[in-house]
Amino acid sequence: MRGKRMNHITVSGLVATEPRSFLTAEGVHITSFRLAAQDRHFSRNANSWVSGDTNWFTVTGFRALGSNAAESISKGDRVIVYGRLRLRTWGDNKMAVEIEAESFGHDLRWGTSVFSKRFYQLPEASDNLRTKYDVDEAETPEIHAKAA
C-alpha cells in the first residue's frame, strides 16, 4: 500500500500547526501543515453537541497554491481542503494520511475572509498572444473599474 493514491477527498478542520513553507532548488513553492478534523453532531439523547474522534492529515500545497497558502493560512484557522488522499505506510503498522491539496481556503462558517487576486507575470514570449477569452479594457470599462 506504500505510496498508493486513492480518490479525492474534501475535509474541513482546524490548522493545527504553523504552516511550513519553502522553495525547492527547482523553484517550486511548497507549504504544508497538519489539519485536525473532528466530527461533531447534535445528540438528542444528551441534548448537546458531541465531539467524535479527531482525524489528522498532513496537507501539502505546491506551486501557486503553496505560495498563496503561506501568506493566507495560519495556525488556528478553520479551512476546507480538497485534494488527493494518499496513505503512506512504513515500519510495523505505521501510517501517515496525507492530502496533496488541489484547493483550500478558509471555512466561512466560522468567520470572514478577504480575497486578493494575484496577478502573475506571463513570460515575454507570451505577451503578444491573445486567446478568444481575452477581453480588452475598452470593451468592458465597468468590470475593470470594479477590479481596480
From Swiss-Prot:
It comes from the Bacteria. InterPro entries: NA-bd_OB-fold (IPR012340), Primosome_PriB/ssb (IPR000424), ssDNA-bd (IPR011344). Keywords: DNA-binding. One of its GO terms (biological process) is DNA replication. GO terms for molecular function: single-stranded DNA binding. Residues 6-108 form the SSB domain. Transmembrane segments: none annotated. The keyword DNA-binding applies. Homotetramer. HAMAP family: SSB (MF_00984). This is Single-stranded DNA-binding protein 2. It comes from Tropheryma whipplei (strain Twist). The gene is ssb2.
